[in-house]
């Protein structure tokens, strides 16, 4: 099994994570697909890729919880003996006015989008550091760079991911472990389902390519960084 590299992707049953899983599997990686609530989507993806003869596993874990994040990493090691690439993709978005953000929503956003990156990365490094090898790719957002009205909590978590990535890259570089972040613009995922057509048209006009990004665009970037 060590002849293939192994990638663990959090939140990979839908959207960007799904596209990443497909591309890596088709490029000869062992792929561990993580999901929390979207079991049907995860199984559908698993069935599709295994029917192609590809090396894929699925594992349910809420990575905002330390014990489940640890279990996910341990499962990956148990299946494939190593983690060559970790992609922290799991995240949620709940647009609303800042004054309408509840304390519970704030805590959920921080734990799901930011703390999960810490939990999974910390556990994965138990295996990467002894090998003096590895790639960590964190999925952030352009809102982590410029901020978004009605998504203050989301923007804060994505900015936190960028800060964590910069610091960790400096710390782990001497150990031959690369750490990068991808900060996508507007990508066509379920997070856009509630937007009106007028809003979508406006977003297209503000994008240099004059189109909404596709999950596959981000997957190609992740594969390049791996």
Model regions: which residues?
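Alpha-helical segment proximal to the catalytic Tyr-Lys
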Residues: 126, 170-174
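Conserved glycine-rich Rossmann-like NAD(P)H-binding loop of the short-chain dehydrogenase/reductase
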Residues: 29-44
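Residue(s) in the substrate-gating loop at a strand-loop-helix junction
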Residues: 141
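Substrate-binding pocket helix/loop in short-chain dehydrogenase/reductase
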Residues: 97-98, 105-110, 192, 203
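C-terminal helical subdomain
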Residues: 174, 181, 204-226
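Conserved glycine-rich cofactor-binding loop
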Residues: 13-15
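Active-site helix of classical SDR
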Residues: 121, 157, 165
């Amino acid at each position: 099994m060590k002849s293939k590299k192994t990638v663990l992707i959090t939140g990979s049953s839908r959207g960007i994570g799904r596209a990443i899983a497909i591309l890596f599997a088709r490029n000869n990686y062992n792929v561990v697909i993580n999901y929390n609530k979207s079991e049907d989507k995860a199984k559908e993806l698993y069935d599709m890729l295994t029917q192609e003869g590809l090396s894929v596993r699925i594992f349910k874990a809420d990575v905002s919880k330390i014990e489940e994040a640890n279990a996910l990493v341990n499962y990956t090691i148990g299946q494939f003996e190593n983690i060559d690439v970790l992609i922290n993709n799991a995240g949620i978005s709940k647009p609303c006015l800042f004054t309408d953000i509840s304390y519970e929503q704030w805590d959920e956003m921080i734990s799901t989008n930011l703390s999960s990156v810490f939990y999974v990365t910390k556990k994965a490094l138990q295996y990467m550091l002894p090998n003096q090898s590895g790639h960590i790719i964190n999925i952030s957002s352009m809102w982590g760079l410029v901020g978004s009205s009605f998504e203050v909590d989301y923007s804060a978590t994505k900015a936190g991911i960028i800060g964590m990535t910069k610091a960790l890259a400096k710390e782990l570089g001497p150990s031959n472990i690369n750490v990068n972040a991808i900060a996508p613009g507007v990508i066509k995922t379920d997070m856009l389902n509630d937007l009106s057509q007028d809003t979508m048209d406006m977003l297209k006009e503000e994008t240099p390519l004059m189109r909404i990004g596709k999950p596959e665009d981000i997957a190609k970037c992740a594969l390049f960084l791996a």
